[in-house]
UniProtKB/Swiss-Prot annotation:
Matching CDD domains: ATP-synt_F1_alpha_C (cd18113), ATP-synt_F1_alpha_N (cd18116), F1-ATPase_alpha_CD (cd01132)
UniProt main location, coarse: membrane
Record-listed E.C. numbers: 7.1.2.2
UniProt membrane topology term: Peripheral membrane protein
A single GO molecular function term of this UniProt record: ADP binding
EC main group: translocase
PANTHER family reported in the protein's UniProt record: ATP SYNTHASE SUBUNIT ALPHA, MITOCHONDRIAL
Entry-linked PROSITE patterns: ATPASE_ALPHA_BETA
Organism: Anaeromyxobacter dehalogenans (strain 2CP-1 / ATCC BAA-258)
SUPFAM superfamilies according to UniProt: C-terminal domain of alpha and beta subunits of F1 ATP synthase, N-terminal domain of alpha and beta subunits of F1 ATP synthase, P-loop containing nucleoside triphosphate hydrolases
Protein name, per record: ATP synthase subunit alpha
Subunit field text: F-type ATPases have 2 components, CF(1) - the catalytic core - and CF(0) - the membrane proton channel. CF(1) has five subunits: alpha(3), beta(3), gamma(1), delta(1), epsilon(1). CF(0) has three main subunits: a(1), b(2) and c(9-12). The alpha and beta chains form an alternating ring which encloses part of the gamma chain. CF(1) is attached to CF(0) by a central stalk formed by the gamma and epsilon chains, while a peripheral stalk is formed by the delta and b chains.
Amino acid sequence: MEIRADEISRIIREQIKDYGKKVEVAETGSILSQADGVARIYGLAGAAAGELLEFPGGIRGLVLNLEEDNVGAAIMGPYEHIREGDPVKRTGLIAEVPVGEELLGRVVDGLGNPIDGRGPLNAKHHRKIEIKAPGIVKRKSVHEPMQTGLKAIDALVPIGRGQRELILGDRQTGKTAVAIDTILNNKGNNLYCFYVAIGQKQSTVARVVDTLKKYGAMEYTTVISASASDPAPMQYLAPYTGVTMAEYFRDSGRHALIIYDDLSKQAVAYRQLSLLLRRPPGREAYPGDVFYLHSRLLERAAKLSDKEGAGSLTALPIIETQAGDVSAYIPTNVISITDGQIFLESNLFYQGVRPAINVGISVSRVGGSAQIKAMKQVAGSLKLDLAQYRELAAFAQFGSDLDKATQETLARGERLVELLKQGQYAPLSVEKQVIQIYAGTQKDTDGQNWIRAVPTEQVVRYMRELIEFLDARHPGIAKAIAEKKALDDGIRKDLDAALREFAGIFKIEG
């Protein structure tokens, strides 16, 4: 058989032409030790803080510590199969998450991966998780109201768009209920909501999602869940993932609301990570930068200036206290970062005062300038009246022979407490709140409060039936308040006439 040189060279040329070997160059290191989801890796000299690493099995990791001869990284996923000596690759990527309208109505994990079984997100945009908060020049003072639908909050501790208002209280005092009611109340208000569940039971998160679906709120809400069974790094990252998704709407000139439920659990997850990374512990074994953990997160909530598109991001962080102790480390940190706090008290909750807001120590530092004029007109003296009632009620326990003025103050205070009670998942529009508070605080032509003759235990029913009556007979009153956002003489006259008419048909039971 004759071997022809030209044929051999042709075959070799064809083989070379089809050969397309790709050389993949990656900086790799090996694991020195791995414990509870934190790995120490040798050999990644070029790694950057916050960079993503690739562990065996495609599991991602996040660089947290950069030391002289090794790197400390948190493993973002199951870590049971990862052993000492396993190779780890640098990706050169900084952690980023999907953002955009595609996330509305979805449930995602702490890294933005869908966990609701409804397929991929198909998001067109991605953003880095850690970015700098807007500076002073880019901001504008808070001036637009963000209604919660709860009389006790909208009247006494109003919240504005772009504000950070802390909700704190012991476990089972209704903190999540306040947050969920706020989401439900903003249906149709062009407010995009983000609910971040940190370290909660999966059954609790499922219940929240069911509630939002039931009331049609899921279409403008995204739920970010890092449950109790997720690794500590996921619980630490989830709030940053949520705020990155919410910032997309803020920066495009729209309005967003983010709820962190709750930041106490994020601080615990961060403490766990820091101790495993052998960072020096401080007070209550938290690391020295636990304040910065929350401040850099909450500073990203802002009301942007007109030049920046006038968008806003409002934050409602939740903190769980132990036995009502607001002076503990994490609560005081977050109180000092936020623009006010709503304190929920277990004693009030058990007495049936729900929402169980302690009006005395709850405050909104910037929300007053965002409150509508009509609410200021009717609720101006409400906080002072309630404070006087609480003071007198404490003294009245010791004496039985009280003068008439004291008895009147106590009777008025009892009715005001009843006036502010509200059922769960029953938020009220601001104009209906104004009507109810007007009926509770203003006087008729005889100088008596409109609800003075109503027995205390029937005030809640009176308020409910009053709204039903006005909706049926005088719908124009609420409409006028909603349009003018103030109570002029004409509206007051119509409201007084309607209250007089209602007083004639309201039946006192018993």
